[in-house]
């Protein structure tokens, strides 16, 4: 990796991505570290998606979806909250900062809230030490690879 931060943001189509789109139309700049991934619903984002993003080089992952209780797919965002909590516990169990995985909620009409969430995630990741990678000599090197492998993913 080139030393630049990389954050993958899984954004639901109905709210978070709509808020991101509106903020882009208003020419509000997002940190260059953030890569948006459009998903139909945050309920479709599983633990393996989050762990694979980290194993493939992301320094942090965020899931951004509808306000709790207002998911367009009924309970998708509640499922996402549970999955993010699971991944945070898993990361902590292998010696990786759980702050690298976070969940944010907003409505489509809240572009400033989306921008604030992305900037907050960027600030948090910037304050953390670099994520150990496979080839590093740190004790937690390859921890995300180990976490992914422990879930039966090659």
Where are these regions (language model features)?
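Iron-sulfur-associated redox domains of electron-transfer enzymes in respiratory
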Residues: 1-154
């Amino acid at each position: 990796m080139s030393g630049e931060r990389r954050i993958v943001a899984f954004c639901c189509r109905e709210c978070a991505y709509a808020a991101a789109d509106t903020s882009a139309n208003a020419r509000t700049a997002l940190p260059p570290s953030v890569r948006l991934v459009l998903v139909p619903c945050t309920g479709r984002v599983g633990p393996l998606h989050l762990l694979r993003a980290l194993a493939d080089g992301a320094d942090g992952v965020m899931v951004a979806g509808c306000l709790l209780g207002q998911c367009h797919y009924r309970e998708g965002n509640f499922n996402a909250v549970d999955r993010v909590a699971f991944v945070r516990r898993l990361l902590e169990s292998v010696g990786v900062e759980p702050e690298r995985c976070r969940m944010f909620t907003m409505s489509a009409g809240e572009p400033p809230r989306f921008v604030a969430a992305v900037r907050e995630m960027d600030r948090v990741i910037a304050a953390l030490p670099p994520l150990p990678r496979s080839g590093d000599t740190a004790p937690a090197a390859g921890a995300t690879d180990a976490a992914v492998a422990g879930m039966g993913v090659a």
